[in-house]
Amino acid sequence: MRERLVVIDDQISPALVQELCGKKIETWRIEDGACVPDRSPIHTRSHGTVCAALAGEFLPELELVGISTGGNGGAQVENVCAALEWCFQDGAAVVCMSMGVTCGLDLARMGTAARALRQAGCWVFCASSNGGKLTFPAAYPWTVGVKFDPTAREVQQVDPRWGCDVAVGLFQSQVLDKLAEEEPFFHARTNSLAVAMAASQVLQAGGVDHLPVKSQKLWVPDGNKAFQSWEKPVVRLLHSRGKWEALLEEFSRQSYWPVLLSDQVETDWSKMAARVRCLEEAAALLPQLAETAILFLEVPEGNPTVWDYQLDLSQMEAKEACRKVLGFFGEEE
């Protein structure tokens, strides 16, 4: 493991990073799916430049490396995956990235790369969506998902069912103070700007589990009402044990993003599943699941008006169950 901190972001200007935080940065970029030295870096105060400067400020003891992945769109996901794979080959100790995707389909390569990095001993810190949606790779169990929360005290661990692992409270930054002299926006704090701060505190504490816990109740007062206003299909499952993973895989294969909320599973967003004990807990997670295609629900009690369809998995295999659900909602395989 090399004592290197890699920042993965859109565009990174080495000259401006050094100007902001006083550290030199080695810069690379993704070109045609490969990570190559950045011979002609841009000179702009981009999102990536700011995040890299913050990494240099909060983790000054590590050698600083930046990978520019380019613009947005579908190719961006592949570029992020290529950058993560390069970090694994490089033997990086820490990765910080303030970017991600809010759709859980076609992410096998990203998940594999994130898991490999963690198994190699690398810490991967990722920003959650500022809009509160479930975000990858931040939600994966192999990364440390970060959000800014002004009610948090410094850096605290949070319930991973929220799709992240730590909440960062208000914090001071010389880099942001310098930027705020010209752009008042930088007086504010966002999930992206909090990543490096979170990384420094988690590493100093020796891991997320050593941080104080922030209490954030997973509960809404009226679960029935919340579900009745939910616009996506809801299917109640019965007897899902041992079968739900195959069911979700089948829907993913059909290009529908499925999520399971159940009292029969442990939370693992890499499998698109979270443990909830009741309808009120499930309802609390609905806002972050806004981009899912279909929600499977398995809780002990509930009003039948909450779900659109009920499925007993003891009676059928995954392919038949998928066919029945799609047929009910008027979709064709």
Give, region by region, the residue ranges found by the protein language model.
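Extreme N-terminal, non-catalytic leader segments
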Residues: 183-192, 196, 200-234
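Walker A (P-loop) phosphate-binding motif
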Residues: 227-263
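Active-site core segment of subtilase-fold serine proteases
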Residues: 1-54, 58, 62, 181
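Mature extracellular/periplasmic domains of secretome proteins
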Residues: 76-96, 107-120, 132-145, 152-166
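Structural detector of well-ordered beta-strand residues that form the stable sheet scaffold
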Residues: 65, 123-125
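Subtilisin-like peptidase catalytic core
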Residues: 37-102
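Extracellular S/T/G-rich loop segment that most often corresponds to the catalytic His/Ser-adjacent loop
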Residues: 9, 14, 18, 135-203
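ATP-dependent carboxylate-amine ligase catalytic core
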Residues: 250-326
